[in-house]
Amino acid sequence: RDIAFGPKSMKLSEAEVDERVREAAQFVGIPEELFEKSPLELSGGQKRRIAIAGVIAMRPGVLILDEPTAGLDPSGCEGILQNIVDYRRKTGSTVILVTHSMDDAARIAERIIVFADGRVAMDGAPEAVFSRADELLAMGLDVPAPTSIAKALRQKGLSLPDAIYTLDQLRDAVLALAGGGGETC
């Protein structure tokens, strides 16, 4: 019912509403058996998924998501992030992800805007932003775990690039130093 609210307010046919509800529910991983449950019977993660599905069902050209992975387990978090990427690719929509999770931003963002004290402090591609890890930390923000690990390894004398922000990049850089050429073990 909650997922259908937006499409119904758009005065779509019942068939179109039903199609959009099922498509959006599938997108966020909500099984059909939850469709008729009361919101009081749902977990926090299920409620968050239903809220996201309600927006997706409207097929917006610009999708703004505020902390969409909050309250989700790691598997649910990864699923939502991948679905956001898939949605952007499939629809060509602009997706604005508001998050404090730099790991989430590192995984899916094409552009990152960092705000500090109500002003834009940084604006650029992930590699440009995360190469300024010390500034991010000084602002009280975390950096992706691979960035922290790479920084610690640089402090121990390893010659690693500044712009490491994903596990794949970290793995490839360490293997390249070891003569492995970036191939997986």
Give short role names for the model-derived ranges.
Residues E16-E33:
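Conserved ABC ATPase "signature" region
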Residues S38-L42, Q46:
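Conserved ABC ATPase signature
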Residues I52:
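Hydrophobic anchor residue at the start of the ABC signature
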Residues R59:
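Conserved catalytic motifs of ABC-family nucleotide-binding domains
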Residues L63-D66:
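Catalytic Walker B motif of ABC-type/P-loop ATPase nucleotide-binding domains
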Residues E78-K90:
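Helical segment within the ABC ATPase nucleotide-binding domain
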